[in-house]
Regions:
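Short arginine-rich
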Residues: 35-41, 120, 230-237
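Extended, charge-enriched "interface" segments that sit outside catalytic cores
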Residues: 74, 80-82, 86-87, 91-95, ...
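Short alpha-helix boundary/capping segments
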Residues: 18-21, 82
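Fold-independent oxyanion-binding glycine-rich loops
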Residues: 10-13, 27, 73
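Mid-to-C-terminal Rossmann-like scaffold of FAD/NAD(P)H-dependent oxidoreductases
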Residues: 39-104
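Active/binding-pocket-proximal capping segment
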Residues: 25-30, 228-230, 238-239
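Short FAD-binding loop at a beta-strand-to-alpha-helix junction that anchors the flavin cofactor
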Residues: 1-18
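Internal hydrophobic alpha-helix adjacent to the cofactor/substrate pocket in enzyme cavities
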Residues: 22-44
């Protein structure tokens, strides 16, 4: 709480609805209580590294007309926010919260991951690097890992993260490129009398706000409370297509 020192709130009082949302806020509140002098939660949990970070950012920056629920569509980095890479995403940031046993377990996992990655980078079949081969949907990392690698601790988990990251690599790069383009499209003009209902990927909440405020460009749309980054990407893409047709 900004007005009462050492008062940490979670759940409906913050404008959310749902057990998962409340549990996530409870976790953040607990961390805040235990580590408020040594950890800055807002800098550790961001839109780019966690769904909790997305939720917190939405709650503190947006005006809520209805109870908040966390959906994957709210996260612009959702292809990166996967359960298989949680150690890679968050372990370094939260190392102060880990016990020695937990830290050792994660270090072992990261070591296994590094060994598997190094082996793949140095392996080729018919002059084609294995990392490139794994981008194909029909390939599996198990086909290119030797028996000694498969005996490493946490091999299954580490190899799954590596393979998923390789197969998603192109999509993640495209996602990052779209986000960069969005920042450069703030001046893109939205035609007068534009029918926002034609954009089927927009949430009903976002559509209603856009119709009500009628922004003149993408920059104005980005400053409307409740408009998500994913909404802006869809809107800018649709507006550009309309401009080409006319």
């Amino acid at each position: 709480s900004k007005t009462v020192k050492n008062l940490f709130l979670a759940g409906q009082i913050n404008g959310t609805s749902g057990y998962e949302e409340a549990a996530a806020q409870g976790l953040v509140a607990a961390i805040g209580i235990l580590k408020k002098e040594t950890l800055n939660i807002s800098s550790l949990l961001t839109r780019g590294n966690s769904y909790i970070g997305v939720m917190i950012d939405d709650l503190v920056t947006s005006h809520l007309d209805e109870p908040y629920r966390m959906f994957t569509s709210r996260a612009e980095h959702r292809l990166f926010l996967r359960n298989d890479n949680v150690y890679t995403r968050l372990s370094i940031s939260f190392e102060k919260l880990l016990s020695k046993q937990q830290a050792q377990k994660i270090n072992t996992y990261m070591g296994t991951k590094e060994k598997i990655s190094k082996n793949l980078k140095n392996s080729s079949i018919k002059n084609e690097n294995v990392m490139q081969l794994l981008k194909r949907p029909e390939t599996s990392i198990n086909n290119y890992s030797n028996s000694s690698l498969k005996k490493l601790p946490f091999y299954n988990w580490a190899s799954f993260e590596i393979e998923t990251s390789i197969k998603y690599e192109g999509y993640i790069e495209n996602e990052q490129e779209r986000i960069k383009k969005l920042k450069s499209l703030e001046g893109l003009t939205i035609p007068k009398n534009f029918d926002f209902k034609k954009i089927k990927t927009l949430s009903n909440e976002s559509t209603e706000r856009l119709i009500k405020i009628k922004p003149e460009n993408i920059g104005q749309a980005s400053r409307i409370d409740g408009i998500r980054p994913t909404d802006l990407i869809a809107l800018s893409s649709f507006v550009k297509n309309v401009s080409r047709e006319t």
